[in-house]
Every structure is written in structure tokens, then in C-alpha cells.
Amino acid sequence: MPTLWKQIVFSFASILSIGSVVLLVVALSTERWVTGTTLCQTGVDLVNASRPELEQFTGHIYYGLFQGGKTRRCGLGIRRAKIYIFPKLIKKINSGLHMIIIFFLFTAIGFAVVSLAFCIYNARKVPYQSIKGPFGLYIWNFIAGKSIAMGFACFLAAIQCHKLTEHVANYSESLFTLVILEENLGFSFWLVVASAVTHGANILVVASSKIHLPKIQTKKPEEPTATGEDFLY
């Protein structure tokens, strides 16, 4: 059986691994990777709108890796539309890069689960192979963290280099052209970043299992010694 300190350390590492999986699943299933403001350029050009009137032609957009939504204002009131990345929109964007992002994140989930399994194993037993001990946990957490970092780096590249938001906003728009006024990374993206940080913290936690705490020694109570006077008494 591992020592009490190691049981505590690996139990906490298990919690971090669970947290990483939860963060990634929530990030993948939500639609706030990017939020932004759009301008209906076609409507502005048609009426030659001045700056005070531009508010009547501004809308909003939000999307994730699988779906999202937008509101469009082109002088005809607010129009809401749902955005689905699959199966059609994926053909209009850099589909290879998009699939790589999803692949990296699912890979990270897989290695986070492996890390969880080995944390539980180390909390209950003393491993007889180094790959099953802290060394293996370093590897699984490093691969998971690296995969996450590659995933959000590719997503940033899709936004900055391939104008992902502009393609998503103008998909299925035949009469109007939408211009991106502002785009921000939403909370779903930052959940992915937090998941990567979790794996870094997990490596530090696992490393702390090597710390040897001093054993608390309890003094045995001294036994009373019988003297000759005690016997006479």
C-alpha cells in the first residue's frame, strides 16, 4: 500500500484529471468559442448610412466547433439564424484545420482519461513498472496538455490567418455582405486553456509525491520501575 501522503497526492491528481475532461467536454459542446459584432455592409452602402445610423445595421455572431448563431440587421429589422458547421459549412472553411482542432481535443480527452486511471491505480497500489507510476503520469499529462495547446493554437490560426469568423458569418448570405467589426474569444475557448493549465498543475502535483515527509514518532510512556522501598511497603 502507498503511504498516506501518496494517497492524498494521487487522489488530488485524479480530481484534476476529472476536471480537465469536464472542461474539454463543456468546451466542445458549447457555442461560445468566438463572439463578435457584424456590420451589414450592403445595407450601409444602399442607404449611404452615416455613423449615427450604423447601429441599425449591426448584428452579433457567436459560434463553436460544431454550431452557433447570429443576428443580422440590414435595415429590415432583426433576423436570427442558426449556424451549423457540419455538414455544409465545413466545406466553405478550412476543413482540414478544423478537423485537426477537433482531433487534438479528443486526443487530449483520451489521455486525460488514461491519466485518471493511472492516478487511481497509484492511489491504491504501489506500481512495479515505472510507466505505471509517476513517470507514466508525466507522459500522459504532457501529451494531453500538448494536444490541447496544439488545438487552441490551430483555432487561433484559423481565426487570424483564414478569417474563420468572416466565412462563418457570410455563409448562406446571397444578398448581403457582413463585415466583422469586432471578434473576441469566448468562454468556451478559455475553458480549453484552463484544461491545459490543469495538466500542467497535475504534473507538479504528481512530482510532489516524491517528497518524503518525516515520520511522526510517538514516545512510549516510561514504565514505572519498582525499587526495594516499594517492596518493603
UniProtKB/Swiss-Prot annotation:
Phenotype upon gene inactivation: Depletion of clrn2 using CRISPR-Cas9-mediated gene editing induces reduced response after sound stimulation. Furthermore, clrn2 crispants show disrupted hair bundle structure and fewer hair cells compared to controls.
One of the GO biological process terms: auditory receptor cell stereocilium organization
Keywords for this protein: Cell membrane, Cell projection, Hearing, Membrane, Transmembrane, Transmembrane helix
Record's GO cellular component terms: cell hair; stereocilium membrane
Main location: membrane
Top-rank lineage group of the source organism: Eukaryota
InterPro entries associated with the record: Clarin
Cell compartments where the protein resides: Cell projection, Stereocilium membrane
Recorded topology in the membrane: Multi-pass membrane protein
Transmembrane regions: 8-28, 100-120, 139-159, 187-207
Tissue expression as described in the entry: High expression in utricle, saccule and lagena of the inner ear. Expression is restricted to hair cells.
Similarity annotation: Belongs to the clarin family.
Function: Plays a key role to hearing function. Required for normal organization and maintenance of the stereocilia bundle.
Protein name, UniProt field: Clarin-2
